[in-house]
Each structure stands twice: as structure tokens, then as C-alpha cells.
Amino acid sequence: VTSEAPVAPPLAAATREVRPTSVPEVKRPTVEELRLTSFKSYRRAVLPMSPLTVLYGPSGAGKSNALDALGVLSRLAHGEEIKSSLDGVGGRRGPLAAPVRGGLAGCVPHGRNAIILGCAVRSRAGTVRLDVVVRTDERVRIARESLTLDGQTLMATGEQDLARGRINTTWHNDSRQGDIRAPLPNGSLITAQLPLRVAGASKGERKVLDAAEQLLTALREVFALHPVPAAMRGWVRPEPQARLHASAANVSAVLHRLEHECPRRWARLLRAVQAAAPHPLLGLGVAQRGEGERRRLLAVFDEGVLGRTGADQASDGMLRLLAFAAVLLTGAAVLDVDPAIEVPDAHRQLVLLAEDLGAGLATEQAGALLRVAREVTGKSDIRLLATLQEPGAALGLDGVELVECRRDPATGHSLLRRIEPVARVPAQGTAAGEAAGLPTGPPAGTVRGGGAVVDLGE
């Protein structure tokens, strides 16, 4: 079965139909929509993204697949070869070191030979949309890609030369010579190649470059955090510039750096952990042993008269909570990401993908963590896309985009449904468990708790 995407309209035709629209000033380019047209368990699904988005559903529903989709777009935005970007380039550090879950082959839906993804980025230039088709039969390549700004096509691909690994690319140019066409390598994201291929000699070309820069900036700083408590319990080497790994295995080294570099953030982290702890917690610390090359560090919870509990003895839930809180309260400076350093900090935004945020935590504890996230994401420099098994921790919290994820029993495809705020209020007299499972049961489009559940497509 061959996977194809609709053919993009000619640039000239698209340009004639566009009318200028006023766009409010946006300081940081922001991913506001993820389109999963054909990716793993998804078909034609759309995930809206707010500063704080919670995707919930049972294990196997496809929540992790949605996080993987945004991770794949982020990897492609770095401009490396597609296969190595998704299968991993090796080494210990960097966003491309390890493969995406399942590698490139695992991203392709069963029985298909292509990945089709897209996103929308709100920027100071307007709404930038990217759509990309990656074919995996024969040579792994970009089969189709388009970049638009407020509906105007700025870049689109055409015919391919499979033998030479090239794809004809046309980009907008408002000079008398018309749009520019050139064959570009099809082994990496075309949009990521534009800054090196477009001269910027005309107003139209500068518009293309600006839109591409806004999109790439928004996608590059995506960090997927899936803490592995077993890996967090070991003594680690001190690192003056420690950056947290996706597994949080080096969290003790990161805490040691944070404690000495920023007492203010350290105090905020302590308050966040104290708010979620089920017992009085006096402080956080980092134990040390050995000297010189043998010096090692271990995070410690100070429980007062109960003593000091090291990370090697702490519960899975508390270790995961510590890792999530540390990332939310410190930002990209201590994460193993490849930031767009050419862009000022004030114009960049971190997107944190939090896998199974509530694992090992009670509903109240997960709720405390979400309240921290709501406070932090309100400042515009961090956005959070988190997954939960049950929605209980997010119910009643203002400012949370709540989306249900489930499988279609007929097709097996993952479905996404946005839960309207009015539908989150539990009906009087229902049990706590029923309230937590509020949006499951009736089919799409029915009314729950007085509000409609909006179907986001298959």
C-alpha cells in the first residue's frame, strides 16, 4: 500500500488567493497544532497544543505515539539525514544520540510505506504550517513537503530524481523573475535546508527565510523526559555543566549543579517537592563520596527526624516527581537539547514532553505537579505536553488543554478528542472513580456533564 499526501497547489495560484491578515505580536514561535495524518497508530488525527496540554487514556491507546510524532518533527528540524535522525546517531549525548522509540521502521503504520506529519506554529510572522511525507520504500526520502504562511505557499516540492536523491523544490520570490526552482537533496527535511539555499535577495525570499526560521526554532527545542527510577538511583560523576538526560539518570549531577549555580531556583524546586511529598520534607541535598576522579554524587531527601533518604532508597514516584519538577523549574539550560543558539533566549521556547506524568503518584501529587506546570507555562518560555492514565489530576484545573486518547474498536486506530472545560465537571453523586473516567463510554459527539466532547478526527 502506498501512502501519499494531497498535492500542494502551485505557488503562484496560492499566492493570488491570499489576503493579508493582521497577526498579534508573538515573541516566541509556538507549536499550536500537531497533525498525525499517518503515523504509527494514528490516521488523520489532530492534536491541539496549549501552553499546558494533558493527553490521557489507558495504556496502549496511543498517547506515547503522539509524543513520538512531535519528537520526530523536532529531530527532522535539526537538518540531519532522516534515517540517522530517527534511528540515532550514537554517542551518549545530544537529542539525536538515541533512536526514537521503535526507530524509523517503528514510525511507519503497519502495511504502509510512509510517514505523514504536519504542524502549525504561531509566530510573529503569522501562522506557519509544515506538511511532510517521508517515504521508506527504496531510499528513505522526503516525498513531499510544503511550507505555508497564513495560507500562502512559500515552499513546495515537486518531481523526484530517485537515482540522484534529489527533489525539485520551488520557493516564493516576488521579483520579476518569478518563483525560484532548484533540485535539493531529499534525504533531509527541505525546510531545514532553506537557510543555506535561499539567498534572501528579495522581499519574497526573506519572507521564506523568516517563516522557515520561525518553524525550525519552535521545533528544535523539544525535550522528551521519561524518568527511569532504576537509572536515577546510582551514584554519578559530578559535571560542572551537567545536562539532564531523557531518562534522568544523571539527575544527581544536575541537582548538584543547580544547587550551586542558582539558589533561587533551588528553593523553588524544594517548595515544589515539599508540596507533593506525603510527609514533612525539610530539604533536598546531594551526598558526596570519594575524592578526585572517584568522587560521586547522589540526590538526598532530608526528612528531618526520620533521617536522610538517598535516591538509592527513594520511591519510584518521588524520583519521577523530582525529575519533572527540576525540568519545569529550570528550563532548557540544564537539558540535553541542541538549542537554536543563533536565536536570542527571549525568542525561544522549550516544549517538554512528559511521558506518564502521574506514574507512581497519587492523584493529589500529580495535581500538585500540574499546578507547578501551570504556573511555569504561564510565563511563555516553557510549554508542556504530558500524558496521564486517568484525567483526575487535571480535572478542575484552569488553563489545562485536556485531550482524551482511545482506540477505535473497529479500526484499531488511535482517536483524539478534546474535552471542553464544561464537560470536566463531575456530575453530582458520582463516585470518584467514575468522575476520573468521565470522558470514556458514550460515542464521540455526545454530551457529558453538560458539555460537548469535540471529535478531532481519526
Language-model segment annotations:
Residues 6, 250-313, 457:
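Extended helical coiled-coil dimerization/tether regions that scaffold
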Residues 303-305, 311-354, 364-368:
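GG-anchored amphipathic helix commonly corresponding to the ABC/SMC/Rad50 NBD signature/C-loop
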Residues 2-43:
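N-terminal pre-Walker A segment at the start of P-loop NTPase domains
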Residues 357-359:
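Short loop immediately C-terminal to the Walker-B catalytic DE motif
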Residues 127-267, 271:
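Electropositive, glycine-dotted interaction segments
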Residues 2-7, 12, 18, 367-458:
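C-terminal lobe/lid and adjacent interdomain/linker elements of RecA-like ASCE P-loop ATPase modules
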Residues 68-139:
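Conserved P-loop NTP-binding catalytic core
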Residues 51-93, 248-249, 317, 321-330, ...:
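Phosphate-binding glycine-rich loops of NTP-binding sites
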